[in-house]
């Protein structure tokens, strides 16, 4: 079926442009964790899909305000201490709460994204993308790992990703990123 693609941007915290029962697809890239009224936003998104419409998400779903537990922080610090100095992050692995004055909606309800999503959408596909260690170490530190000819960088990047997968799968660190495809529970009954 030929369909015209119409797209627009809207503010997740008020969604003034969105219309009910109107969209074949919604694409979300890391905006739901900024929703101050997450339940309201999810309901509006769900209402806006046509009966066979899908929502595609790549989203931050880690701890609210990026505040991991002390136990998780210690695991991150332990893994990072294994790295040579040049690969270690110079930034806080758990950011001070004062940092959120700059962007007050950053990760405001990120820990509720998955459960709220599942309240309004049936999961068609989902995959945890981990990140509980690797993202924290690589964030603002990726340049040391970017040279494709640097064998040492490749080795330590693989090490980070292995530890990230291991500790995420064991539930010892939070999964920070989640990919999902969902179908509205509301529109699926229309």
Residue ranges and their predicted role:
Residues 2-14:
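Conserved SAM-binding strand-loop segment of SAM-dependent methyltransferases
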Residues 8, 27, 56:
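Conserved Rossmann-like nucleotide-binding pocket used by diverse enzymes
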Residues 16-26:
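A short acidic, Gly/Pro-enriched loop at the edge of an enzyme's catalytic core
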Residues 24-38:
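A short SAM/SAH-binding and catalytic strip from SAM-dependent methyltransferases
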Residues 39-54:
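A short glycine-rich, Lys/Arg-flanked "PGG" loop and its adjoining helix->strand segment in the class I
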Residues 54-87:
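Conserved class I S-adenosyl-L-methionine
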Residues 84-145:
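Substrate-binding/catalytic lobe of Class I Rossmann-like enzymes that use SAM or dcSAM, i.e.
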Residues 120-190:
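C-terminal lobe and adjacent flexible extensions of AdoMet/dcAdoMet transferase-like proteins
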